[in-house]
């Protein structure tokens, strides 16, 4: 009986050992694959925009400054770069290929130090494969982390350095594999929102009835708010001023039969401290350029406390030698009470407002 038991124990132990070896081999193969994908992604990044091919990139630059006080003005300067491909398009059928992000780099400067994050995504399926971070506090505490993930989001390997020395996961509290996974997925959500949102844009809700405020007063208030916003933008853009803005630049070519398009969004916001801290947008602009033409749009938000409604939209475009110009004025209930458009275009205040809501949602996702 003892021999039988011992034999069974031996067999089970062998099976466990073999299973662990296979698991280790599988893990090693996964890490090897991730490193190969990383090397391929870096090659594509280095060649981006060369060989006569259009670039497929999104660049986000955010400057966030607190109010001056004490010995210094707190400032965070962040650059985020997305690299992507278009997959599965059919230009003859008018089908735009899906934009698939394969690499993201984030550089942010805080407390006088430049910090880095890099995210590698599967170039076909889009899930996170690898996350890297290198950061330093104002006191000189340096941390470096590497996390490797499988297709289900499980961490299969992690490496840490503290003060340039090999360390364990519990040697610092800067991040962990779950926080980096969520950060990578957040970037993926933001990317999909910017590049893969289908038209028409989601419709914004509005009140059943227009505002009871006289039209003349509404126009006066909107024009005053516009002038004030422009003054604040001028101060924001001055050298040495308190800057709070985000700039998003998209270089894209939806298919080989379409020309490259560059889109620039710029969002200006203010820091609100009461009743709880948050960032409040007050002006957003969009500029689009391609060989077919160009357009420029402005979105003014209601300056009233607690309001996030767009109250004015301006659109100017040039295409095939024709100039188009549109102005839409909205009350606090979302109704367009005044529009001024060129003769060659039809007035479409509702789609214009819906597009404004879509752009706001991008900045909402970014600022979370």
Outline where the language-model segments fall:
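Sec-dependent N-terminal signal peptides
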Residues: 5-18
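Short helix-loop boundary/capping segments
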Residues: 127, 136-138
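Beta-turn initiation residues at beta-strand->coil junctions
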Residues: 105-109, 132-136, 159-162, 285-289, ...
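Hydrophobic "anchor" residues
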Residues: 127-128, 155, 310, 336
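Surface-exposed acidic loop/strand-edge motifs in secreted or periplasmic proteins
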Residues: 52-116, 120, 233-295, 300
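Long terminal segments
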Residues: 26-79, 138-260, 320-368
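A short, structured loop/turn motif at beta-sheet edges
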Residues: 121-127, 151, 300-308
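Sec/Tat signal peptide C-region and signal peptidase I cleavage site
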Residues: 20-24
């Amino acid at each position: 009986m003892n021999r039988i038991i011992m034999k069974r124990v031996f067999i089970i132990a062998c099976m466990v050992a073999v299973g662990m070896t296979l698991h280790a081999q599988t893990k090693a193969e996964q890490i090897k694959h991730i490193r190969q994908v990383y090397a391929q992604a870096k090659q594509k990044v280095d060649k981006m925009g060369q060989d006569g091919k259009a670039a497929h990139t999104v660049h986000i630059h955010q400057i966030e400054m607190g109010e001056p006080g004490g010995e210094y003005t707190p400032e965070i300067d962040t650059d985020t770069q997305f690299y992507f491909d278009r997959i599965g398009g059919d230009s003859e059928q008018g089908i735009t290929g899906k934009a698939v992000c394969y690499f993201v780099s984030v550089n942010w400067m805080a407390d006088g130090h430049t910090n880095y994050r890099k995210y590698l995504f599967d170039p076909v399926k889009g899930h996170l494969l690898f996350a890297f971070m290198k950061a330093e506090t104002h006191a000189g505490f340096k941390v470096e982390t590497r996390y490797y993930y499988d297709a289900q989001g499980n961490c299969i390997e992690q490496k840490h350095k503290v003060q340039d020395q090999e360390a364990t996961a519990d040697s610092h509290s800067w991040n962990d594999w779950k926080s980096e996974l969520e950060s990578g997925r957040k970037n993926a959500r933001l990317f999909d929102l910017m590049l893969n949102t289908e038209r028409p844009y989601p419709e914004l809700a509005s009140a059943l009835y227009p505002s009871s405020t006289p039209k003349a007063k509404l126009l006066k208030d909107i024009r005053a708010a516009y002038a004030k916003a422009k003054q604040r933008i001028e101060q924001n853009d001055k050298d040495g001023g308190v800057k709070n803005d985000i700039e998003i630049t998209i270089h894209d070519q939806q298919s080989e039969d379409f020309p490259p398009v560059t889109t620039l969004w710029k969002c200006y916001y203010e820091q609100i401290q009461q009743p709880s801290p948050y960032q409040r947008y007050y002006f957003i602009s969009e500029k689009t350029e391609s060989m077919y033409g160009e357009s420029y749009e402005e979105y003014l938000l209601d300056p009233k406390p607690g309001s996030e409604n767009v109250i004015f939209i301006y659109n100017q475009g040039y295409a095939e030698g024709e100039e188009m110009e549109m102005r839409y004025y909205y009350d606090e209930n979302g109704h367009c009470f005044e529009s001024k458009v060129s003769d060659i275009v039809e007035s479409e205040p509702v789609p214009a407002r819906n597009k404004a809501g879509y752009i706001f949602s991008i900045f909402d996702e970014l600022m979370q």
